[in-house]
Amino acid sequence: MDVFAFNASLSMCKDVAGIAGNIFAFGLFVSPMPTFRRIMRNKSTEQFSGLPYIYALLNCLICLWYGTPFISHSNAMLMTVNSVGATFQLCYIILFIMHTDKKNKMKMLGLLFVVFAVVGVIVAGSLQIPDQLTRWYFVGFLSCGSLVSMFASPLFVINLVIRTKSVEFMPFYLSLSTFLMSASFLLYGLFNSDAFVYTPNGIGTILGIVQLALYCYYHRNSIEEETKEPLIVSYV
């Protein structure tokens, strides 16, 4: 009875962490909306790049496939979050293609085809693996690698913040959402004993803490600089 109660509690904690992760991830998925409102208003993609949305779609589709019962077990929350994420990214890509120039249209359509082709190869290839454990390792490593590279992308922004001593290019709520989502899925992976979930999200959690710490440090410094009286005051 004690073992049953423990397993039930573990399952409940996993579900709570997964639901929280889905909620925080939704905040990330809607974050590009102001950019696309501007694109639609100006009927131009200007200098914006569509590559982040292509890569995000690829990442969501790989992780979605990993979450299915064909690959792993008890990962329904991974399926929901990545289904929603893939839908958002696909909508962003379609809007980008509609409002960009002809050259970029062809480029984005080509990349979109590559994404679906790569995912198709991964799905078809993994289904050819008869052993469930080997299949889990194969797709798990791909999913883990994809997530790690996605979480590593803010390293450029972190370097920029340190170099410029400004948090202008690192929005607080985006960093907070990333940290909360990563921390939630870190717990989800731990409760589910899934190394391919808790490892990349553990890295994401650490990077999220670094971003928030840098934001607090440099934001406080910028406020102090603004409120500091100048040594020489001139009156005109």
Swiss-Prot record:
Q: What triggers or suppresses the expression of this protein? A: Slightly induced by the powdery mildew fungus G.cichoracearum and the pathogenic bacteria P.syringae pv. tomato.
Instruction: Tell me the name of the encoding gene.
Output: SWEET2
Intervals, Cytoplasmic compartment:
37-50, 98-108, 159-170, 216-236
Q: Which InterPro entries match?
A: SWEET, SWEET_rpt
Compartments, as annotated in UniProt: Cell membrane
Tell me the disulfide pairings in this chain.
none
For this UniProt record, give its keywords in alphabetical order, as a comma-separated list. Cell membrane, Glycoprotein, Membrane, Repeat, Sugar transport, Transmembrane, Transmembrane helix, Transport
**This protein's name:** Bidirectional sugar transporter SWEET2
Single Gene Ontology MF annotation = sugar transmembrane transporter activity
